[in-house]
């Protein structure tokens, strides 16, 4: 994010922010078929998952991303809707429990592990689509999303 902002300020141009969850949702539907929603999880460390829902807005590329939540793996699995399409790097830490859910008919669908991580080709396609629709972000407005303080920040507090 910092490099993109510096380049945009230096060249006096706007940016297009592409959420990682949008990238992963696009890849999941490309592999598994169109869905209106995709559940995306990331490993949040400390035994938790960061979960968001990507809802299709337009063009199979532009997604609305829900407010993320931190959940234990059990809490996350309990909130999955039936027949959910699930993706994201958090699946790598949940392999055994996800496999049990995938094996049960009508529970959820998971793309191959190659689709769990964002690809530059997908990010650029989403970025171009957003640019063509005028969905630009000023460098000052583009910020990464942090859910909590790092381990170091937690330890530095009294």
Predicted regions and their residues:
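Surface "functional belts" at beta-alpha junctions
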Residues: 13-118, 132, 146, 151-156
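Active-site glycine/GP-rich loop and adjacent strand/helix microenvironment
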Residues: 124
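Short Gly/Thr/Asp-enriched flexible loops that form oxyanion-binding sites at enzyme active sites
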Residues: 1-13, 99-100
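Short, hydrophobic alpha-helical segments
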Residues: 127-135
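Flexible, glycine/charged-enriched surface loops at secondary-structure junctions
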Residues: 136-140
């Amino acid at each position: 994010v910092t490099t993109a902002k510096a380049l945009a300020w230096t060249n006096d141009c706007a940016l297009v922010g592409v959420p990682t969850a949008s990238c992963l949702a696009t890849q999941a539907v490309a592999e598994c078929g169109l869905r209106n929603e995709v559940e995306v999880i990331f490993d949040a460390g400390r035994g938790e998952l960061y979960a968001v829902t990507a809802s299709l807005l337009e063009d199979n590329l532009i997604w609305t991303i829900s407010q993320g939540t931190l959940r234990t793996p059990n809490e996350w699995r309990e909130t999955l809707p039936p027949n959910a399409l699930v993706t994201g790097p958090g699946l790598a830490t949940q392999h055994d429990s996800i496999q049990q859910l995938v094996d049960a008919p009508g529970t959820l669908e998971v793309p191959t592990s190659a689709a769990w991580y964002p690809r530059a080709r997908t990010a650029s396609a989403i970025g171009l689509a957003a640019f063509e629709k005028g969905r630009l972000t000023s460098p000052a407005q583009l910020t990464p999303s942090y859910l909590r303080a790092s381990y170091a920040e937690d330890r530095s507090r009294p």
